[in-house]
């Protein structure tokens, strides 16, 4: 007689509340653990946090904030190619060792044009150049502050006499000394022929000192990734993102283990060979192996675990997240392809478990959707502050451009869409910096309990399977909470 269990059940499916990590002998203090890890084959993070490519989670403001904390943000694709590329460019210009392609204004431009540029790029000064890009002056907001004639040429009000400049070999310490000595905030960098080649600002030097753990490229710019779908304009979108300076591209679909995604991966590797390509989402080792064999520089693991995802109940498909992460980790163990554990995280302890199961980093959505930097709308409800948060499979998000993620790009009638997500609200949480601080603290504590000095060492940790009674015992019980902690709320609160 055939057995359903013997014939059809191929694995146990466990997730975060099914297990606990077993404490081990430790010589590791939480404050001494090393959190550096890899986001993709060639991109190193200083903390293992990636913000999700969701339209209520990551745009430039979030990407800047998470990169300054040591992680990386993935800018969502629910916008035009031009707007997504612009969001990437904003991140790349937010902080620099030296700005290699500074915004400039040509001779003859008006005060109105200078003010427009300053407002668009949120900058306080613009080098003025001639037709051959020779530096002829610099105009700052101080020059424009009381100027009433908007049609007046900037040539008449810019600083041009005794301009303080430096050369490309100047390091940031020497540049800081020059800025301090001359009491200026912007230092143009020129070549031997006085062509403008860069700009060093006091603000960037200060930021670098304030955030030494920031995730930066080799030019001192914040790192940023961006999501793309599997559509006819994917390669055009990728090229625009590369031109804007993107560090990695995420091919973001609901089912990464599919022919169209693998074909798009091959096209991407041929089209932009010097950019890391991350592919997701998947839930099995077989999927991971196929993507790695076809050139993926990282894989994203998670089908249906997210708080706003309904894939598992709508489609009946998915793998509980810890089992999925471990299956993928086992398949990729002998490769140099990292995995990103995406979804299902509610507490910092879940992050520790996801990394211990094999993740190199975790993707976070709901954990940061309530922060100041998220693009979601602010909502006041019953006197409390919330922010909107929706799945990319929700009807609202699909109407704005995420239909292709769920292979419904050709569906024109909104009534014919089959959503795999919901829209809702999450409590306001303050800034990303405050949230990441608590998550880093929980991760450090967990690694200390496990005796793991690095995330790679954390992969060796062991788990114990627990019952529902064990889950209840793990949470505060038999008490009324009178003082809330910044890193804990009761389930379903």
Where are the regions that the model predicts?
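Active-site-adjacent beta->alpha loops and helix N-cap segments on the catalytic face
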Residues: 31, 80-89, 147-151, 195-215, ...
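Catalytic beta/alpha-barrel core
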Residues: 74-78, 104-105, 125-127, 165-166, ...
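Bateman/CBS regulatory modules and CBS-like beta-alpha motifs in cytosolic regions of diverse proteins
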Residues: 33-45, 52-54, 83-121, 128-130, ...
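Alpha/beta catalytic cores of nucleotide-metabolism and tRNA/nucleoside-modifying enzymes
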Residues: 1-25, 105-106, 167, 227, ...
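Glycine-rich phosphate-binding active-site loops on the catalytic face of alpha/beta enzymes
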Residues: 68-83, 246-258, 297-315, 345-379
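Short beta->alpha transition motifs characteristic of CBS
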Residues: 75-80, 123, 127, 135-150, ...
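Short beta-strand/loop segments at the ligand-binding rim of alpha/beta enzyme cores
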Residues: 44-51, 97-102, 217-227, 268-283, ...
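Catalytic cores of alpha/beta
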Residues: 61-64, 236-244, 277, 283-301, ...
